[in-house]
Design a protein with these regions (language model features):
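N-terminal secretory signal peptides that target proteins for export/translocation
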Residues: 1-14
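Intrinsically disordered, low-complexity serine/threonine-rich segments
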Residues: 10, 31-33
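Extended rod-forming repeat segments used as scaffolds/tethers
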Residues: 10-11, 19-21, 105
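Bacterial N-terminal signal peptides
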Residues: 15-30
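Extracytoplasmic metal-acquisition and chelation regions
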Residues: 33-302
């Protein structure tokens, strides 16, 4: 019976409390720059990057930060509406991943507020896999844009922002080295997942991802076809795949069924949440995920 690993993943939010959008309209919209600059991030891993780049000059609020909460049940609150309304800078994923924040931004418009849509930085569009923080290019692009945005708002500390950006880029090198190492060892390895939370990283690692139609159906909240379910089960039972990744923060009966089949067949199972764990920065979170995948695949490596 394989051990179960844990790492982080992605967020989908489908329930919006429409009445709260109105609260954003009546919230204060005065965005005169003060110290520290107020940054709101829809996802906590983006908020962490804002803290690393902004340093002592920013105050960061991350809206989605509880790995024990089912993100599908996330509900807006008056405090969230106020935070977004009062922010100098708002960061969110985009491409239909966090549409609730777009509603709040429309409801509390401000010519002075800067908005960073992370998907736009790397040319992703609606319909693309939204778990873009696993694309190695994404985080570097966000850090660079944050530094530029903060310099424009606070040119007196230009050197500080640039120094923090340089340190951040340097801190990503161990992750890049780990990706290169795992790609050399495991490129071409057939793997699968109940949904495509790790898709961009699998691509960076050069792995062969199976059951993508099944994953796409789950991502779009539709029932996988009978043939897709049968193919998935067969891949697990016949050891056609070497690893199963599932979302431990928002699961359903069919995903739980695939986990049971994988464990019974001796396929390593790696579970993950949809927010970064408490007490970890982006770098330690990503390295932990890569380590979990490495441990799982090493158990059956030749």
């Amino acid at each position: 019976m394989p051990d179960e690993e844990t790492f982080g993943g992605r967020i989908y939010l489908h329930r919006l409390i429409g009445g709260l959008v109105g609260l954003a309209v009546i919230a204060s919209t005065s965005l005169a720059l003060a110290e520290p600059s107020k940054i709101v991030a829809a996802e906590n891993f983006y908020g962490d990057i804002a803290k690393q780049i902004g340093g002592p000059n920013v105050s960061v609020t991350s809206i989605l930060s509880n790995p024990d909460q089912d993100p599908h049940l996330f509900e807006l609150s008056p405090s969230v509406a106020r935070d977004v309304s009062d922010a100098h800078i708002v960061i969110y994923n985009g491409i239909d991943y966090d549409p609730w924040i777009e509603k709040l931004l429309v409801a509390a418009r401000s010519a002075n507020r800067k908005t960073i849509v992370v998907a736009d930085l790397i040319g992703k569009k609606t319909g693309d896999n939204p778990h873009i923080w696993y694309d190695p290019a994404t985080i570097s692009a966000l850090a660079k844009r944050l530094s530029e945005t903060l310099v424009a708002e606070d040119p007196a500390d230009k050197a500080g922002y640039q120094q923090r950006l340089s340190r951040f880029d340097e801190s990503l090198k161990p992750i890049q080295a780990k990706i290169a190492e795992l790609r050399q060892r495991f490129a071409g390895t057939p793997v699968t997942a109940t949904e495509p939370i790790f898709g961009y990283m699998f691509e960076a690692l050069g792995m062969q991802v199976r059951n993508q139609a099944f994953q796409l159906a789950v991502m779009n909240d539709t029932e996988p076809s009978a043939s897709d379910i049968i193919s998935f089960e067969d891949d697990l039972k016949t050891h056609r795949v070497k690893l199963l990744i599932y979302n431990s923060q928002a699961t359903d009966p069919i995903a739980e069924r695939m986990q049971k089949i994988a464990k019974a067949a001796g396929i390593p199972v790696v579970g993950g949440t949809e927010t970064s764990p408490p007490g970890e920065n982006y770098q330690s979170w990503m390295m932990g995920e890569l380590d979990a995948v490495e441990r799982a695949l090493s158990k059956h490596a030749p």
